[in-house]
């Protein structure tokens, strides 16, 4: 299936790396570049679905970890999937829950098989494998889903960052094998922390799995913006041209503009809606 078609933006934008395109999903087309409002628990805080449509929102991001914790992916599936559950008939993207497992869950224990962690809600022990993460995302039923990954925090040394990147690649292979739903586009996630050689390896090994899109993870995790932009500059020109690029967790107005200038098609960020309910 041809998921993505690029469109020219003009010479000045081409020189900067920016581009425009259309991403096709079962719930409609998405014109890129695009910002995704974050509906962590299947709702964008303080905003009704009809209001999101009125302001032109094309796609919403929902969080796999939080929906798995409550109300549970099986319940969402029984309700007809996320689109019916949240009364949203446009495209939805779910992350894999990997970032939350490592950042929110207490006492997590990472193994090649998967991750043991205690729920931040009630403390119960859970075990998430790449296959389990895909099964949860299949149940949720989003149009675009992410592979399960290990995100290393800013300041992690080279050895740890390399191990996390290599584990992410192994998990990607397992995610791809487990994913059977042709109506959901699976994106691999590029990791490698702030080490350019690791980023390049991660991207190269992920491209065979990037049939419908690719995500850039592990940025905006505490590093100065100059370092983030430097990594993005380094990656520009190395991405496949025929699929969308999703910059995860980055979407403040200045970062959005800088990302688009560096060839990014899609961004998501919670802080544009959280201040409205403070």
PLM feature segments, named:
Residues 178, 182-272:
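Glycine-rich phosphate/ribose-binding loops and adjacent secondary-structure elements
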Residues 2, 158-165, 221, 225:
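Flexible, glycine- and charge-enriched loops at secondary-structure boundaries
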Residues 10-181:
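Non-catalytic, usually N-terminal nucleic-acid engagement modules in DNA/RNA processing proteins
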Residues 1-13, 271-278:
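Single conserved hydrophobic/aromatic residue that forms the stacking wall/gate
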Residues 2-5, 85, 181, 238:
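Generic structural signal for beta-strand residues in well-ordered domains
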